[in-house]
Amino acid sequence: MTHQTHAYHMVNPSPWPLTGALSALLMTSGLIMWFHFNSTTLLMLGLTTNMLTMYQWWRDVIRESTFQGHHTPTVQKGLRYGMILFIISEVLFFTGFFWAFYHSSLAPTPELGGCWPPTGIHPLNPLEVPLLNTSVLLASGVSITWAHHSLMEGNRNHMLQALFITIALGVYFTLLQASEYYEAPFTISDGVYGSTFFVATGFHGLHVIIGSTFLIVCFFRQLKFHFTSNHHFGFEAAAWYWHFVDVVWLFLYVSIYWWGS
């Protein structure tokens, strides 16, 4: 490390990949225990260790990038490629869910009554809460772009305001989605309609929670003056992720809520 003559970051040995893998094992085992034996002990242990791992791992990355200067332009380029590939992998995840939905809805089987939505299913009105959710996410896309432009112009206060608005809209979306699930006239066990609806929208909702967490971390980092107009990849990655979540929701709204109803 002392005599390094290249622009790459040679990472020091870290325990977090190991603790992260163990926490993932605990979480998946805990889910099975919860589903089959109604015991949440293992799941809670897995979630706790996962949160602790993420906190400490991200803390180390922030130290390396912001305070130690290890994230050179070459390293940032690699991180950009990594984030792009990660988002592409997420696109493929959602492609699978849309495939399942269209496979079931374009050629409904006789067991479903030969129609879509299946006989006995009362779909949600796309012009009520789903339309409000769409407006909320589109507004958050505008505010995150405002935050990015403010950062590039060196306007710290506007950046913080825009970021706070984006986080608030993300939390509002999650609350609206939770209320919609609570009041839905069908469940995940109501045949293929219930399973495709809840898996696709639930997976998207999980991504909104992850994206909101990402933005909250960026908000606190900006409070501590971590970002500059030419060194802010953490925020840029969060913004990319948030726009991805926006676009996926538009496809979900048009496919499942509007056309599918």
Swiss-Prot record:
It is a multi-pass membrane protein. It holds the Pfam family COX3. One of its GO terms (cellular component) is mitochondrial inner membrane. The keyword Transmembrane applies. Signal peptide: none annotated. InterPro entries: Cyt_c/ubiquinol_Oxase_su3 (IPR024791), Cyt_c_oxase_su3_dom (IPR033945), Cyt_c_oxidase-like_su3 (IPR000298), Cyt_c_oxidase_su3-like_sf (IPR035973), Cyt_c_oxidase_su3_a-hlx (IPR013833). Component of the cytochrome c oxidase (complex IV, CIV), a multisubunit enzyme composed of 14 subunits. The complex is composed of a catalytic core of 3 subunits MT-CO1, MT-CO2 and MT-CO3, encoded in the mitochondrial DNA, and 11 supernumerary subunits COX4I, COX5A, COX5B, COX6A, COX6B, COX6C, COX7A, COX7B, COX7C, COX8 and NDUFA4, which are encoded in the nuclear genome. Component of the cytochrome c oxidase, the last enzyme in the mitochondrial electron transport chain which drives oxidative phosphorylation. The respiratory chain contains 3 multisubunit complexes succinate dehydrogenase (complex II, CII), ubiquinol-cytochrome c oxidoreductase (cytochrome b-c1 complex, complex III, CIII) and cytochrome c oxidase (complex IV, CIV), that cooperate to transfer electrons derived from NADH and succinate to molecular oxygen, creating an electrochemical gradient over the inner membrane that drives transmembrane transport and the ATP synthase. This is Cytochrome c oxidase subunit 3. The lineage of its organism: Eukaryota, Metazoa, Chordata, Craniata, Vertebrata.
